[in-house]
Amino acid sequence: MEAQDILSCVEPFTAARPAELEVLGRTAVRVRKTPASILCHDGQLADGLYIVLRGRINLVRAVDGNRDLILSSLGPGEVFGENCAMPGMVMSTTAVAAVQSEMLRIPGEALSEHLRREPETVVRLMRLQYEKLREVEAVASGLALCDVEQRLRRTLARLARRQGRRNPASAGWILAPVPTQSELARMVGSCRETVSRTLSAMARNGLVSGSGRRMILNDSLVNETP
């Protein structure tokens, strides 16, 4: 698929004029990363807006000691690095490829020029940033107010709504590839062993099922979890 066609399907560019998308698409570069590769560091100037085409990118923040917390896990169609359009703004997280990943990178200067010509993209970009801020606030409030099972339910439901698809065979959502138990632990501020026990209990209660990198989430888990 051509870069222009990709941009037309991805927020914040869905309302931009085709001619403007063609101009922006000519500046785009495809980037491929192997698992555990770092795209940009916390505190570093963002070198562009990235659109995830394939794979999964974790946005990570270092916490006390040698631990880190995954604030967001992005799949195909999701973006990061949008603050590159604002001179002097740095990344607030470290972006790490969780699996083999491919992205489309839009240089910051090209994005800034596009925003000057397309005010609707500006509005959609602001909405996108607001939604990301709300997600980070939800993670923070979960760490402070919820136990591990509640945090894990919220995390899985959020991933299913953003990256999952309806299961045509039965009621539920398919999440594939699902993050590893170690990644889930870093998303909920716990350890892998606790997450493993919690997932087993949820499976016994019929909330989740599956094997390997594929998980099916019960409708009640996705629909009733904030």
Please state what every model-predicted region is:
Residues 72-130, 134:
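Cyclic-nucleotide recognition modules
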Residues 22-23, 39-43, 169:
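Short loop/turn motifs at secondary-structure junctions and domain boundaries
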Residues 21, 111-112, 222-223:
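A generic structural signal for short hydrophobic patches within well-formed alpha-helices
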Residues 1-35, 79, 84-85:
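Cyclic nucleotide-binding regulatory module and flanking cytosolic helices
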Residues 148, 155, 159-226:
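Phosphate-/nucleic-acid-contacting segments
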